[in-house]
């Protein structure tokens, strides 16, 4: 709702007030009923700050409660009026401490006056309400009430204002009520209109009341304030007002002019509008106290006042029309209070107070007319005002809650911080106090022990003195000397103890000062940090502002650039349009030229079609000639085939004879192989290569004879070692002529000249690539078929001679190889050892693969079957036991195949195999780490009777002596075995060997893999050990750290410069500390005592004759130095401890030295002297 509209409505109302001269009569009761139905009154909470009446119950807040939000200073003689509730329609039950609102005469300037129905007043009343119209001013509160009798039942509509008939009826039925006034020890006031205030101003109290004066008069008219005070109505609530007496009739009250009322309403309207715009409530009473009449209507133009005359009322009236001041009469005589009641003869004025001020002028008794239009405007304005007040109240309450909540959170955080700081200081002081008490108790105990020892020595001296009397004077002198020495020692010892106690006290004082300084320093650092953060925030704010300024400047620059670019683009587009126009004209000219070229192409196409027709005719003629030529060639080929079949029969006979000779050669070679196997050198690779090549050549000799078509001499020469098959030259005149088909090549189809040139080039390249041919004497077929020496064919003799020569040459070569292998020169010996190492690698890999296959086929797969069928095993346990066995088996299979391939080739190269597989060997890490974990599970499996039977059956089926445990440990041992075998091969491989680099890199890779596996295994074991110790040691600190690992443990005795850290302990030695524990028989095996750090420690060997070592933590010149002397069970343990300590502390620059006991004593004395100084 716009506030300007509301202000315009106010101006219209003022104009109507000036123009109205006569007001019509209005039925106030029916209008009030309609208003109550349309706008039911909300049930707001009522706070009763007055003292409780004699019959009322105790309120929640008490008589002295003051709302802290609106509390202001108040005098001892006056207080804010208390709101009261009365239901005029029903007259229902009332609670204690609530009063009827129509118990006083409020004389203000009413815009509307209405009649209220008091007929339905048959309801019961609770305490605090009375049946008579009497008011008793007690020491605690003022109580008011009405008579609930049914004599007040006449409706306002039957009231005759001219004849006062209603008055006469009431005069006959109801006696005149009287008001008894007594002196109030505590002046209290009741705000009768606060219940009808707008929602935004509900429960708000104005305590800026003016001090009231007691006077004999019992009625005050606050409308005369304008005569005594300034016209500014804000000062009306700030300066004390002088009460004035009113006459017995309502006509004697002073009135204010309509002009003053309109001015006041305008000023208050403008002020409230200003506060509404600013979002803050006004400090003036017009903003905080919005008093409304009983039907919550806004001020309207002046209407005549409805007055009900009570013949029995007295001549005095008590008027309640000011929310901030209330007068209470104090007089020895009885005074009558005029109530707005039909039975009353006095004048009662009902005012309707608004939020812009009060018009306290009275009207004539006879004017009761009202304009119907003004009431419709009044209801509309009332709705607007209610909506505005509700909205304002919600916003104000929300802001107040947020403000209070922020302060509450701040105070809570501040209190928590102070409590935390106080708690830390108390804890520090408590620790210091406990430490001092412990130290003083320890010193007292030591002194008591020393006194007991001195007493024992005195007793011993007395006994010795008694015995010495018998011996003589010499013994007496000796005893005296001993006594003096003891006394002297006692005095020295006492001095030493006192010095130590003084030292401890000094140390404690120094520690306290250090703690205080540390706390002060910490607070200073925190303040500096806060200041720094504040500076940073300021600098960030400045930087942000500068950045915004820069961004704004850059944005402007960019906009200017964009404008320039747009101009350039427009210019470019214009130029582009010109270019497009030029291109368009050019394209039109090109189109004309293209049309001409199309016509020329059409003419050329027609000429080409004519030429193609002529060529087709020529091709058909050429095809016919080719068909005739093919027929002729087919006849020639058939004749040649017949002749070839005859020749093949002859060649078959010749091949059979050669097979018999080859069989003889194979038998001889088998004998030689058997002999070589029986020799001392077994499985030599060069020999195997040579034999395999001979066998292969012998097997391939018949096929080569067939391929060369009876070229016997050439096939025999091809069987020689280290010779390739020879293709004889065609120009040779000594080649046998097998058939005319081969001698005379068949006619071929004519080929284009380009293909013929390509074939010739290929033949020339083949001839260039061929090796030089060994010239072998050849014979013609006639010469070979000749019979010599009666029964032998010349060709057969030639063949036998050639075979014999080859056999002799081969035998000679074998003898040379044997001699070379049996020789003892270093080179041969090195080659032999290398071959043995390679062969061992292959044989062990083969055996390892066989073991993995047995483990898979006879244990892993059957166990999975049993787990599914008989539930003898669990699938989870099987997977844990065998881990990644399948992956390892696959790798071993591939390595075995590759080794077999490489061993069949000379020279043997195996290094690249392991270089290739080295990264894959990391899968062994999972198997190795899992092996120790599954050992207990596997043991439990084997101990089960059914499982034990299963494992024995599978072992018998596998026909292997090894059990499952031996098979499972093989993958763990395989990687170290690779390293040993490759190291042996590298040892026997010379640097100039082809395989040296690969073997070396393979050995280094496998070595790194083994180191990686061992490190991972060590980390897993160390973590398991740390977890075990964490569980065993009670109250132990956090042991599991990434850099920490366990070294050893031992029982020992410790002597330290702190007596509480001395005694017999059990030590756990880690790489960075020594954990001191004691054995315990309760919930854990060990109990944590303290820790000896090794970071800045110095390890010393006291003597070589004992089993003690000393650990010094810190510098000897420092006060906080710690010295621990550890006595180990034996010298052997001492040596092992020193060795481990030297290994763990050497990288940190700490050396372990050997010092004699005298040197250590001297250093301890120097340390004690430095402390005394």
UniProtKB/Swiss-Prot annotation:
Q: Which Gene3D superfamilies match?
A: Dbl homology (DH) domain (1.20.900.10), Pleckstrin-homology domain (PH domain)/Phosphotyrosine-binding domain (PTB) (2.30.29.30)
Which intervals hold domain PH?
1044-1146
Q: Where is the composition biased (Polar residues)?
A: 50-62, 119-133, 220-239, 280-295
Q: Which GO terms describe its molecular function?
A: guanyl-nucleotide exchange factor activity
Protein's recorded name: Rac guanine nucleotide exchange factor JJ
PANTHER family associated with the record:
FACIOGENITAL DYSPLASIA PROTEIN, RAC GUANINE NUCLEOTIDE EXCHANGE FACTOR JJ
Organism per entry: Dictyostelium discoideum (Social amoeba)
Bias type Basic and acidic residues, positions: 262-277, 470-479
Location of region: Disordered: 1-380, 458-479, 712-765
Q: Which GO terms describe its cellular component?
A: cytoplasm
Q: Which domain of life is it from?
A: Eukaryota
**Ranges of compositional bias, category Low complexity:** 8-23, 35-45, 72-82, 98-118, 134-143, 153-191, 208-219, 240-258, 296-380, 743-765
Which PROSITE patterns does the entry link to? DH_2 (PS50010), IQ (PS50096)
Q: What is the lineage of its organism?
A: Eukaryota, Amoebozoa, Evosea, Eumycetozoa, Dictyostelia
Protein keywords: Guanine-nucleotide releasing factor
**IQ domain: residues covered:** 793-822
| SMART domains linked to this entry | PH (SM00233), RhoGEF (SM00325)
Start and end of every DH domain?
A: 833-1016
- Function comment: GTPase-activating protein.
């Amino acid at each position: 709702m716009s506030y300007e509209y509301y202000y315009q409505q106010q101006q219209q109302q003022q104009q109507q007030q000036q123009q109205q001269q006569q007001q019509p009569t209005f039925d106030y009761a029916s209008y009030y009923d309609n208003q109550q139905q349309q706008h039911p009154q909300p049930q707001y909470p009522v706070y009763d700050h007055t003292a409780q009446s004699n019959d009322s119950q105790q309120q929640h807040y008490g008589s002295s409660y003051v709302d802290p939000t609106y509390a202001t200073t108040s005098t001892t003689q006056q207080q804010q009026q208390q709101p009261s509730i009365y239901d005029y329609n029903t007259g229902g039950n009332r609670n204690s401490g609530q009063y009827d609102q129509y118990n006083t005469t409020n004389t203000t300037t009413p815009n509307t006056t209405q009649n209220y129905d008091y007929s339905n007043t048959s309801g019961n009343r609770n305490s605090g309400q009375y049946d008579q119209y009497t008011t008793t001013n007690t020491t605690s509160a003022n109580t008011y009430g009405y008579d609930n009798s049914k004599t007040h039942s006449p409706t306002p509509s039957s009231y005759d204002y001219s004849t006062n008939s209603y008055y006469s009826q009431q005069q006959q039925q109801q006696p005149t009520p009287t008001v008894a006034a007594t002196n109030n020890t505590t002046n209290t006031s009741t705000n009768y209109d606060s219940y009808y205030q707008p929602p935004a101003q509900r429960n708000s109290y104005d305590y800026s009341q003016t001090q009231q004066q007691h006077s004999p008069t019992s009625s005050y008219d606050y409308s005369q304030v304008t005569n005594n005070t300034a016209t500014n109505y804000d000062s009306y609530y700030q300066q004390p007002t002088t009460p004035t007496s009113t006459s017995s009739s309502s006509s004697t009250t002073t009135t204010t002019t309509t002009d003053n009322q309109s001015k006041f309403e305008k000023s208050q309207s403008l002020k409230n509008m200003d506060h509404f715009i600013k979002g803050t409530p006004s400090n003036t009473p017009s903003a905080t106290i919005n008093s409304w009449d009983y039907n919550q209507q806004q001020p309207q133009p002046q209407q005549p006042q409805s007055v009900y005359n009570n013949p029995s009322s007295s001549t005095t009236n008590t008027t309640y029309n000011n929310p901030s001041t209330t007068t209470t009469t104090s007089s020895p005589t009885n005074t009558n209070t005029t109530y707005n009641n039909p039975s009353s003869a006095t004048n009662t004025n009902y005012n309707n107070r608004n939020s812009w001020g009060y018009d306290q002028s009275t009207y004539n008794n006879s004017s009761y007319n009202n304009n119907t239009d003004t009431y419709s405007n009044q209801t509309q304005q009332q709705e607007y005002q209610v909506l505005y007040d509700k909205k304002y109240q919600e916003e104000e309450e929300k802001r107040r809650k947020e403000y209070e909540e922020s302060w509450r959170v701040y105070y809570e955080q501040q209190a928590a911080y102070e409590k935390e700081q106080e708690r830390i200081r108390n804890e520090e002081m408590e620790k210091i106090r406990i430490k001092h008490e412990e130290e003083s108790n320890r010193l007292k105990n030591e002194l008591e022990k020393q006194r007991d020892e001195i007493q024992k020595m005195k007793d011993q001296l007395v006994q010795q003195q008694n015995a010495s009397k018998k011996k003589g004077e010499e013994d007496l002198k000796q005893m005296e000397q001993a006594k003096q020495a003891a006394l002297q020692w006692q005095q020295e010892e006492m001095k030493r103890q006192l010095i130590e106690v003084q030292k401890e006290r000094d140390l404690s004082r120094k520690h306290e000062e250090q703690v205080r300084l540390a706390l002060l320093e910490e607070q200073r650092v925190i303040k500096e940090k806060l200041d720094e953060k504040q500076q940073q925030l300021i600098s960030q704010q400045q930087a942000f502002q500068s950045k915004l300024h820069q961004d704004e400047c850059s944005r402007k620059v960019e906009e200017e650039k964009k404008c320039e670019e747009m101009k350039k683009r427009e210019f470019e587009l214009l130029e582009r349009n010109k270019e497009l126009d030029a291109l368009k004209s050019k394209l039109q000219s090109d189109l004309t030229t293209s049309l001409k070229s199309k016509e020329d192409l059409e003419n050329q196409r027609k000429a080409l079609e004519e030429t193609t027709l002529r060529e087709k005719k020529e091709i058909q003629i050429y095809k016919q000639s080719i068909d005739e030529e093919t027929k002729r060639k087919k006849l020639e080929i058939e004749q040649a085939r017949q002749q070839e079949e005859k020749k093949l029969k002859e060649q078959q006979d010749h091949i059979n004879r050669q097979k018999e000779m080859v069989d003889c050669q194979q038998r001889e070679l088998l004998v030689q192989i058997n002999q070589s196997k029986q020799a001392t050198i077994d499985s030599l690779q060069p020999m195997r290569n040579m034999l395999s090549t001979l066998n292969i050549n012998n097997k391939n000799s018949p096929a080569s004879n067939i391929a060369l078509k009876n070229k016997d001499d050439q096939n025999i020469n091809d069987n020689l070692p280290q010779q390739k098959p020879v293709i004889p030259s065609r120009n040779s005149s000594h080649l046998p002529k097998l058939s005319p088909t081969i001698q005379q090549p068949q006619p071929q189809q004519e080929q284009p000249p380009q293909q013929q040139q390509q074939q010739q080039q290929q033949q020339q390249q083949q001839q260039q690539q061929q090796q030089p041919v060994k010239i072998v004497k050849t014979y013609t077929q006639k010469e070979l078929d000749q019979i010599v020496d009666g029964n032998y064919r010349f060709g057969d003799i030639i063949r036998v001679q050639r075979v014999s020569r080859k056999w002799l040459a081969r035998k000679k070569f074998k003898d040379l190889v044997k001699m070379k292998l049996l020789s003892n020169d270093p080179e041969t010996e090195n080659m032999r050892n290398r071959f043995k190492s390679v062969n061992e690698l292959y044989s062990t890999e083969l055996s390892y693969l066989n073991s993995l296959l047995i483990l898979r086929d006879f244990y892993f797969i059957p166990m999975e079957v049993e787990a599914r069928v008989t539930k003898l095993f669990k699938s989870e346990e099987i997977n844990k036991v065998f881990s990644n066995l399948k992956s390892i088996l696959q790798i071993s299979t591939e390595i075995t195949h590759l080794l077999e391939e490489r061993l069949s080739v000379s020279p043997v190269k195996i290094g690249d195999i392991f270089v290739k597989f080295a990264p894959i060997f990391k899968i062994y890490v999972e198997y190795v780490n899992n092996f120790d974990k599954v050992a207990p599970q596997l043991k439990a499996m084997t101990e089960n009777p059914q499982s034990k039977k299963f494992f024995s059956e599978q072992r018998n089926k596998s026909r292997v002596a090894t059990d499952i445990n031996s098979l499972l440990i093989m993958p763990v041992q395989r990687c170290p075995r690779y390293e040993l075998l490759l190291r042996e091969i590298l040892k026997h491989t010379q640097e100039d060997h082809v395989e040296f680099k690969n073997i070396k890199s393979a050995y280094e890779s496998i070595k790194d893999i083994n180191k990686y596996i061992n490190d991972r295994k060590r980390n897993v074991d160390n973590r398991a050990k740390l977890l075990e110790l964490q569980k065993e040691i009670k109250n132990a600190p956090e042991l599991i750290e990434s850099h920490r690992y366990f070294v050893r443990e031992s029982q020992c005795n410790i002597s330290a410069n702190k007596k509480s850290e001395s005694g017999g302990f059990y030590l756990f030695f880690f790489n960075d500390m020594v954990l001191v524990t004691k054995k315990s028989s309760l919930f854990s095996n060990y109990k944590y005592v303290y820790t000896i750090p090794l970071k800045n420690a110095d390890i010393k060997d006291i003597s070589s004759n004992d089993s003690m070592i000393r650990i010094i933590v810190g510098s000897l010149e420092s006060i906080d130095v710690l010295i621990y002397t550890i006595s180990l069970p034996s010298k052997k343990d001492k040596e092992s401890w020193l060795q481990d300590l030297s290994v763990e502390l050497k990288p940190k620059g700490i050396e372990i030295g050997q010092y004699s006991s005298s040197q250590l004593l001297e250093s301890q004395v120097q340390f004690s002297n430095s402390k005394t100084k």
